């Protein structure tokens, strides 16, 4: 008799008619034992999340459905049990942590009521006992001040706190299997490290089998016992974590691992002594005013940027790293004059542009451009790609025909077909849209490029392509670049120098290789220590 908690055999999930392919998942075979962590890894569209949702019976029926295979749990095929029985299994026997807790948690119910609902649905328990158990769960996941958390609503918690609350709900009834679908993807590196440790500790304590879905090989190296690699709905390779990470046999696995940025910084380039950008004592504060028409309580004042001083030399890439809320993106928007500063100077080629009005600033716009984190949100969905790229030069007085020709040339530079010129943003993948965003930023022939988390939402292979493209463009066009990221692996491969930000302040600056080798500030040390899979980056896995 099998000792596995879960056995998936020849699973196939069919897509509705008219889709780009017939099957989302084909011939998938997986097994999960008690106390084991199985990581299912792959890029977007590989079928990872649909496989997990099939286990839970959460496929978007009737359009997407299991057509072949079985999902065996405790002797039952979950593809054949009734809906009512499956509801009993969810939460009590198999639980799931979703990628985005803000959309998975009920926004109009307090955290305490949502945990209480789990108990009320599955077991007969008095209200006082339910409250005590909910409090204990919040303590187990290391949430501060459980009483206030119980009464708080999801929007009142940070991302890490919301994820901890969801873990508490998932573990409320001590399930045999915990499915974690990209639970740390949207979290900062220190919060990610805490959540990974929490899941591991609770797993050992409660003998839980964990099915962990991710695209991050650093996370895989940190927590996995076994790994299954998915591509186009199929498992192309599986085995022990050491075997798959250190001796992959399938070309797709090899390509994915080769695309993962290493934590060892590359050698810094010798940049020009000429300073193209100087930021001196820049500050920016939000809030502090009253509500509509001056009534109501004063809004909380947030000092997003505090007395920041930086410089950027010609031809170099300066990385600005830090966690959410550190002020990185606010500083970038101040530098490019998308928002006004409270104080300080911003000089481009020695000219202070911080106090210039809109009309006086226009000639300087061509010298400094920005690549945004979410290209889909920053591209007008109603305008063709060629017009999006040509729009900047046209507003600067360039003739439309000349601007269109420049747009076609830039599409070639960023590796897109000339047919893209007449298409719309929704017709492209995420990586292609980011290439379009880069082309648009280059249309005005800038001297300085600010890239704000340009690869954070991309799969690892696409991420590697975009980073390579940015490096090629920087060299060909003699650009100076500010690269904003929270991913220290990316920073190690891209940046010549680093500025580390925390709570709006720059706490450490220096050459990238020197900061990685000998960080001086405690916060920098904390960030570096929290990067997952550091043992693997030296050729060994954590396990």
Across the structure, where does each feature detected by a protein language model lie?
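ABC ATPase NBD coupling module
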Residues: 65, 78-95, 113, 121, ...
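Conserved ABC transporter NBD signature motif
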Residues: 66-77, 344-352, 406
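Conserved ABC ATPase "signature" region
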Residues: 77, 129-148, 352, 401-419, ...
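Conserved ABC ATPase signature
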Residues: 152-157, 161, 424-428, 432
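A short, proline-enriched helix->beta-strand linker immediately N-terminal to the Walker B motif
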Residues: 172-176, 443-447, 463
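A short, surface-exposed alpha-helical micro-motif characterized by mixed small hydrophobic
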Residues: 220-222, 491-493
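ABC ATPase "signature
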Residues: 235-239, 247, 506-510, 518
